Amino acid sequence: YKISLTSKETQDLFNSDSPLFGQMTDVTVKKDASLSLTDYNEPLLETELVFLVQEDVNGDDTDEEVMRKCLVAPGIEVPDGRYDDWFPKTTFYEVIADGAVNGAVVYGEAKQYSYDDVKNIEAVLYLNDQEVKQGNSEEVLGHPVNSVKWLAKALEERGEKLTAGRFVSSGTFMLPERLEAGKYRVEYENVGDVQLSVKP
């Protein structure tokens, strides 16, 4: 799963007062990877923590229970719309219809972390070793675990569950950047880094 519109800034862009989610396949989720711009329409780049669910997550689980049930990895998401000139012009309902504009998710080493380990942490995005932008985990509904809990509840409302073996790209620390060719790296405080090579 990927979760979008997890900050007030992104919700305002799409006139929404809540997040939304879409489903992703194993094909679109990769460990430290190389991508080609020719495989995408108008891709962006976002900095997100990826939760790998080890044990079923319930909507009423505590923060600590969710963290215990998941491994967390540094991640990069590549949103991509199927419409021309889609960002930020796509509407809220078009984003839903487009599977929350999923393109790809790349993640690094996954480990067990506590709630405090990923609370109020910084992420720094680099392109070709030059700093591009910084962001903070508080942009993700105050804490990324809140995003996972929101998803678990949203699934339960549909009669579904957030089950072991699933992954969750939990929401961006910063507004997205246009993806371009080069070598990207995101360094996350406490969580390590993830790299992505993008070919023209």
Predicted regions: what they are:
Residues 1-142, 180, 193-200:
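Catalytic-core "active-site belt" of small-molecule-metabolizing enzymes
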Residues 127-129, 170, 189:
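Short strand-turn-strand beta-turns centered on an Asx-Gly dipeptide
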Residues 145:
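Gly/Ser/Thr-rich active-site loops/lids in small-molecule metabolic enzymes
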Residues 148-153, 166-168:
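Short, structured beta-strand/loop micro-motifs enriched in basic residues and often containing a Trp
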Residues 155-159, 191:
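Extended mid-to-C-terminal alpha-helical interaction segments
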Residues 162-175, 179:
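Conserved metal-binding segment of the jelly-roll/cupin
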Residues 171-172, 188, 198-200:
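Active-site proximal loops enriched in glycine and acidic residues that flank catalytic Cys/His/Asp
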Residues 184-186:
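A short tyrosine-centered beta-strand micro-motif
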